[in-house]
Amino acid sequence: MRRFALLRLLLFIIFSMGLLTLTACSLSDYETNIHKINEEFYNISIKTDTADIAFVPSNDGMCRVACYEEAKISHSVEVQNGTLTVNVVNNKKWYDYIGVNIDSTKITVYLPEVEYSSLVIEASTGDIEISKDFKFKSIDISLSTGDVKCYASATEAIKIAASTGDIFAESISAGSLDITVSTGKVTVSSVTCEGDITVGVSTGKAYLTDVTCKNLTSTGSTGDVSLRNVISKEKISVERSTGDVTLDRSDAADLFITTSTGDVEGSLLTDKVFITKTDTGCINVPNSITGGRCEITTETGDIKISISDD
């Protein structure tokens, strides 16, 4: 019994020392570094690994970049050829990765002006938020894991791509809008686009509300699509393997909707010539013979479309 008690005590001591070591390794030193920018710039480029990124208006007319970061993973901030660049500098050794950090890096960019040229962000993990106070010529965001909230407009293209995360684009105008996510939800609300809107979601739902554009294309494997008050001048094209497609007072000159497993229901604003097919399900569409084409195909699901009276 005494030998068994000593063994238990020894195991407890070893476990406690291991836990303390793990905790010590987990608690990385964090610090706030503020970079004041005096040079003039037009473009913004950020390349980082793991960090939340936010753009907010400067309250004193000065540009600065505040980096709350690990001591061994810092960021260089400088202006090069008219571009404000923020790049990660990783000085960690392999043993510095032992453990789990309980804090997270954050980059806050305080901008004095309202309009800039290009914004390019490349990140691995973290959330990104761009305030509605800014306007760019173009926006290009590439992210592995994290949410993106874009409230800033662009005169040309807005491109947002993520592997895993939710993407929000709200109250903006753009020349074109291209959103791609492998796993996550896409929400597009109150958006005016002179050109095309493309939404690609492999697994996840897509919600579009109060949107106008030239052409709308939505593709994906699994997930519902909701179009509410979405108006395309030329074409709406929706393709899904599994998921329902809902149209609420939405319209285009021509519509093409395909889903393998799911219902297609809702209302349009103008008459269409309906071309429909379902292997298992019922079809209920107007018998109109004027208007553009509305082709709807589903293998397993109902097709129910009406023309709004309003």
For each feature predicted by the language model, list its residue ranges.
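Sec-dependent N-terminal signal peptides of Gram-positive bacterial secreted proteins and lipoproteins
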Residues: 2-27
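Acidic (Asp/Glu) and glycine-rich low-complexity loops/linkers
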Residues: 19-143, 149-162, 166-181, 185-200, ...
